[in-house]
């Protein structure tokens, strides 16, 4: 099926990523490689850590977000030096580039590392070096988004924010904005109202996870109390029609993560995601991979999953692609470049499907 013309179009479509956690790109192979390099002992009482293959297999059995987070926090313990963080991010950028991602806005969790004695400087210098390499090697534009862990006290978020301000990371463009992640339920957005207010006063961009496992009130609180400019996940927005209308009218982009929602059992099937409802309501959204090392797919696999279950038209894909570009935290010039690339892709696809099919192609389509 992935050989059908529409899938080739999706493969070539210029993509923007807005919801990927760099720590969630830590593949089992890289976990074992860095553990050996840095002398880190992985849990001996868990058979999952026998080999990279057994670790990968264990990722098939997540029951909820917290199940996943357990493996996630063990894996990041292998990240010690700046070169480790650079290797991790560059591995993601390489894969993303191969799948047609032209612009990537990536999350990182400094508190995960500073809490275990790794300095903020080490984390950011490694990730920013990978961003520079991605631009140089692939022509990819990138943004780092610094996330606060919502299961930690808000005071910890203030400390992390102060560290970034001290380094002038927002002013010099090394960090493009702030986000809010980790366990959602029982940690509503309003707990972080003060630090987000400080960010807003300084003109720093703001996003946050809401409406993944939490109900629509988490989304509303994020908008009202944190002045969020984007909503990460947001699939439960569909349960509140008035709020959905507001999000559409205010052009608040959602960053959806289909395979993640399936793996963490937020939905029982990709077909349950409110893709049609969002398209019909004019809610802008992008499609993203979240934590691809754990959830069985990077950006393209998520795009294909949506196509398989919703059979979108080229026009609908153009809406998604353009919404992703316009919702990106990039210059107007860069947006124009990417929008032009989408139109070029559409023209090439239109010309391709208007050509007479060869016998081989016809047989392939029938199959």
Curated annotation (Swiss-Prot):
This is Adenine deaminase. It comes from Schizosaccharomyces pombe (strain 972 / ATCC 24843). GO terms for cellular component: cytosol; nucleus. One of its GO terms (biological process) is IMP salvage. The gene is dea2. Its main location: cytoplasm. One of its GO terms (molecular function) is adenine deaminase activity. InterPro entries: A_deaminase_dom (IPR001365), ADE (IPR028892), Ado/ade_deaminase (IPR006330), Metal_Hydrolase (IPR032466). Its cofactor is Zn(2+). HAMAP family: Adenine_deaminase.
